Amino acid sequence: MESPLIYVMLVLLNVFVFSSGVIHNKGKERTYFSCSGEGILTGLHTIKLFLTMDNLKVRCFFRNENQSPSKEILGLFTSGGLAPNMIITNSTFYGGYYFKLTPFSNRLEWLIDIPRQNITVNTDIAAVEQWMIKITMHEGLNIYDTEGTLLDLVREPILQWNLGRVLTEMEVRDLYPEVNDIKVTKSPCANDVALIGFMMKPSSNGVFIGKTISGFWTYKECIWHDLTEIIYAELKDEHQGLTVIDLVLTNHFLVILTSLGLYVSSDLRYPTTSQIKLSRAEFCGFERVDYIRGNLWYNEKCFANRESFEVDYVTITFNRNRTLSESSSCFFSKEPFLHWLPCVFSTIKNEKSIPRVITFLIDQETDSGIYLFNVQDTKETYVTVAMLKDGKPSPRPKFPSFHFPSTFTLPLGMIFHPRSHFLYVYGSQIWVSMDGGNTFEMLCNLFSHHVTKTSNSFYTSDIVFIVEDGRILTTKAGLTTYSELGILKDAIFTLYYDQLGYIHKLTPENFDAGSKLLGHGNSGSIFGKRPDLGFEAILVPQYISTNEMYFFAHVPLTMPTNIQWKKRFKTIHLGKTIEFSKTGLANIKNVYMHKTEPVGFQTSIHTEIIVPFGIENSKDSPCLLSDLEITYSGKLYYTIKLLSKNPLHELKSTDVEKSVLIPGYSSFLIMNITDKWTASALATMPQAIKSNLKFLTGSWFLYNFGTAGGRKWSISTRQCNYWIQQDSLDFMSLNLVKYIDVGNTIDFQFKIIPKAMSTFPIPPVSMVVGNPGLVEVKTQGVFDLNENYYLDIHVSGRFFQKGSTSIALVLWEGSSKCYAITLLPTIKSSCSYLRTMHHTPGRHIPPEDWISGVHKDSQGFNMIKTLPINYRPPSHMGISIPLTDNFYHADPSKPIPRNQFHKSKETGKYKQCANVTSRAMCNCSEHQKFSHAVAFSDCKEKVHRFKFPVTQYPVVLEIFNERDKISAEPPYLVTMTEVNMRKNWQLKHNEPENVKKMKHYLEPLLKTPVYNPLGLNLTIQGSELFHFKVSVVPGVSFCELSEEFQIYVDEVPLPFPGHALIAVATSVVLGVLIFIAFVFQLRNIHPLKALKKSIRGNPGLTSSTTVSS
C-alpha cells in the first residue's frame, strides 16, 4: 500500500494550483461592497459607475446580507491594514487601482480617486467597450468581491444626441393603455446603454422611445423621448397610424422601423446638431400594411478598436411573398445604410413556389450570407449559406442547403448569439448550428406552441426564448440542452440582459431586475421558484450498475393517444437532475424514445447516480421478507408470487405502483394485486426474460416512484458542476479579444475542475472555431490524478489575411446554473492597437530629470538639450537656412529664428499650434511634450544630447505586445529616414545570407535601402538636431510598425563650412611657404642671416690709406 503522505502531498499540490489564476463558477459570498460614484448610489448588489471628463471618484461601504455598514466593520479591516482594490477590465484591458487605507468621512467609507487619463486618454466619440469592474478584498482565506460596470459617458455615440422632446412622467403614464408591444435594442459594446420603444395600438399615433444608461435598473432612470415630429419631417403625405415596429442600435447608427417606413440616423460619431437626424429609406411597392408586418435583423458585434474589415449589416424582411413586379421582400444594407439591396433574386414565375426569406443574416466571420427560407406550397423550410462577392450574396450556395423536417411547421426567425458563431433558428421548434448554417441540431420541440421573442447576454452566454404562452426557455451558447426559467403572466413584456448578464423583465409601466441578485443573472424574484420539470407519471428504475440507472416512465395502456405526451420524458429533461424525496440524486445523461417495447413505457432516461436512491423497508412493505418468483402470464403482464405464506409477509395495497428491482435482471412495475401473495406487473426489459425467475429475500428490492399519495420525485436544473480556472492576466475576461500578427502564435491554458462526477476519460470541453480557414488551432488535453482536465490551446495564423474568428470553449456536460459554461475568446488576425515598436536609448534618464532638463554624466556634460523656441534644424544649405516644415518647441507669440532667407520663409508650418496666438493655446499635453512623433513636434521641448561626433550609436529596437516584448530582428527588416531631410549620417548593419536575399527583393520595390535591425549602428557627422524615423518593411506584419527618435549633436569644433575653409587656407599658406623657401634656396638667399644682422644692428665703417714716395 502506498504511503498516506503521497496522498496528502497530492491534495496540497492541487490546492496550491487551484489557488492561482482566475476561477469561475465558485459562487458568491453573502457579503459584498456597495459603491457609488459622484453621488450615484444604486443600493443594489451590483455597481454602476460612470466616467466623465473629471476624475473617477468612488466611495464604498462593506455590507453583509443581514448587517448594515458600520464603523465597527470598517474599523476591523482597517486596523489590520486592509482596504479593497478595484479591478477594471474589458476584452483587451486590465488595470488595478487601490483604495485609500484610511476610510473617508469619519471612517465610514473607503475612497478612491482616479484621474481619467489613468483609465483612458481618448475622448473621441466611438464605439467603446463598457468596462467591467470588481471591488475585491482579501481577509485571511476569505475573498469579498462585488462586480459592476463603468460606462464612458463621453464617448458612447448614442448618448451624445438629443432623441427628441422629453416626455413628462404623466405623459408616459397616459401611453400605457395604448401600448400593444415593446421593443428593445442595446448598444453592441455597452449593453447597459439601451433603447426601448412602444408599439402603439392602431388607435394611437406616435414614436416614443426610452433611453437608459444603467441597464433599466430603475424606471425613473429611463428618459422617454417623443420622436414623432422628427419622423413627420421626413414624411410627405400619410401621418396617421405612426408607431414603432422594430428598432436596432448598431455600433454607429440607429435604425427605426415604423409603420410608415424605415428611418436611419446619421453617423452617431459625428454630431453636427444636438437633435438626432433621421432619413427615410425608400422601398418601392411597400405600404403601411407591409411595414407593420416587417422585421429588422442584426448580427450583434462590438466594433471597439474597429478594423477595416468590420462593418455592420442590417436586414429588413416583409412578411409576405414578393410580387412579380418586385425585386424582393427582403433587403439588406451595410453602414451607412444609404443603399438597400435585395437579399436574393428569383426568376421563378409561380408565386407560391417562390421561397420567402424569413431571415437573412451576414456572417462576418466567414464573410457569407445565411438565409432562412420557407416555401408556401410545399411547407418546406431550409437554410442556405452563400458567400459574399463584392458585398452581394453569390447565387451559388457555399454548401448544400440544410432542410428541416416537416414537423417544423412554423419558422419565425434566426439569430446569432452575440460575439459567437452559434446560430439559432426558432419558431415551433428551436435548432442550433455550430458551423455557421451547414448543419443543425434540434434543441427543443414546442409542438403546438412557438417562440415569439429572444434575448441574450454576450457576457454569460445566456439566451432565452419567450414562448407565446408565457414560458421562458433558456440555454447557454453551444449547449444542446435547455431548461425552463418559469412562466410570466404579463400581457405585454419582454426580457433584456444588461452588461453583467442580469436578466430584466420590462413592461410598459415597470422594470423588474429582481431583488435577490447574488450571482450572475440570478433574478429569482422575476420568475419565482424554478419550475419542477417532472410530470405526473410512475417511474420504474432499472439497475445498470452502482453508478448508473435507467428510469422508465409508465403510460397507461388505456390512455388516449392525444394526451399520452403528458407522461413522457422530453428533451428538456436532458442534462437535468432527478431527485427522490426520500433520498437520492442522479444526473440525466440521455433521453430515449421507445416505439413498441417495452409495452407501457414510451420513454426512458439514462442517469448517473450522485446519491443512491432510497429503497423501501420491510416495515412499509413486509413482502420484502419473502422469496420471490416471477412468471410470464402471456397477456403482456408478468405474475409476481411471494413464496412465503407467512401472514406477516403478504402484499399490501400500498405496494401498487412500486417497482421491483433485481440487480442484473429486468425491473417490474406492480400494476395490481390479485391476492395477498400474487400481483401482476409490467417488465422494463421483457426481451431479457427467457424463463421463470426465482429470487431469495435480500436479493430483490422495492422502490416507490409512484404517484399514489402524491409524486415523490422531481426534476430540476442541476447545480453548477464545474469550476474553470484560467491564467489570471491572460484571461480576465470571458470574452477577451486577442490579436495575432503574421507568423505569431497565441497560447491559452485552462483547468476544468469537476465538482461532482467527472467525465473521465472523455474530455469535458468541446471547441468550435468560427472560421477555421483563418487560423490553425491545436489542442492538447490531459487528466490528472484527481480527474481535473488541463487544456492547452495553440493558435497560429494561416495566411497573410485579415479577419476575425471566435473560438468557443463549451463545457458540454456543464449545468446552465454555472454562469461560465461557454468561453468565447475572439481572435483577430490583424494589428493590435497595443502592438508598437520602440527605440531603447543607450542611456537611461529618469523622468524627473526630463522635467528639470538637467542630467549630467560623470564628466559634467548635460545629456538633455532644451530646444530653442520655434527651432528648426539646419539643412544642406547651411545652419542659418532651415528648409524643413517641422517646428520644435513652437510658440506662435515668439519670433522665428533663422528665418531671414526666402526659402526658409516659404517652409515651416505649425501643426498643433496652427491658428493660435500663444503656446498655451496649443494645448500640448505632457504626453505630447515627451513624444518623439513628428506629428507632435510643435510640443517637443527636450531631446537627447550627444557630443560630436556620434559614432556607432546602437539603434536598439523592440516590439511590444500586451504583456511581453521581443527584439526586432529578421524578418522584421527596417527602413530609416531623417524626417527633416538631413544627410550627414550613415548606418551599418549585419548582412547574413537571408537578409541579403530579402534586401535584393525589397529595395527595388520600396526604392529605399533596407536594413537588418539586429546590430544596427548609426554614425552622425553633422551638428544639431537629427530626427530619425524607423519603419518595418511591409508584408511581415499587419501593423505599420514605426518608431521615431531624436539626437542633438553638440560641441562641434566649428560649424560647417568653417572647418573646411580653415583646412583649405592652411594648405594654401603651407604651400606658399614651401615655394618661397625653395626660391630662397635656389638664389642662395639666407633670410635667417639677414634677420640676425638686422637684430644686432649695422657696425661703423673704417678706412685705411697708404701713401708711397
From Swiss-Prot:
Q: What is its main location?
A: membrane
Pfam families per UniProt: CATSPERB_1st, CATSPERB_2nd, CATSPERB_C, CATSPERB_head, CATSPERB_Ig-like
Q: Name the keywords, alphabetized.
A: Cell membrane, Cell projection, Cilium, Developmental protein, Differentiation, Disulfide bond, Flagellum, Glycoprotein, Membrane, Spermatogenesis, Transmembrane, Transmembrane helix
Q: Where in the sequence does glycosylation occur per the annotation?
A: 66, 90, 118, 321, 672, 915, 923, 1017
State which residue ranges cross the membrane. Answer: 1056-1078
In this entry, the parts of the chain located on the Cytoplasmic side of the membrane are 1079-1109
Q: What membrane topology term does the record carry?
A: Single-pass membrane protein
- The reply on keyword Protein biosynthesis is no
The source's domain of life comes to Eukaryota
Write out the GO cellular component annotations. CatSper complex; cilium; monoatomic ion channel complex; sperm principal piece
Extracellular side of membrane: 1-1055
Cysteine disulfide links: 35-60, 189-302, 330-343, 720-818, 831-1039, 913-922, 924-939
Q: Where in the cell is it found?
A: Cell projection, Cilium, Flagellum membrane
Relate the assembly described in the record: Component of the CatSper complex or CatSpermasome composed of the core pore-forming members CATSPER1, CATSPER2, CATSPER3 and CATSPER4 as well as auxiliary members CATSPERB, CATSPERG2, CATSPERD, CATSPERE, CATSPERZ, C2CD6/CATSPERT, SLCO6C1, TMEM249, TMEM262 and EFCAB9. HSPA1 may be an additional auxiliary complex member. The core complex members CATSPER1, CATSPER2, CATSPER3 and CATSPER4 form a heterotetrameric channel.
Give the free-text miscellaneous remark of the entry.
Answer: CatSperb is absent in sperm from mice lacking CatSper1, suggesting that stable expression of CatSperb protein requires CatSper1.
Name of this protein = Cation channel sperm-associated auxiliary subunit beta
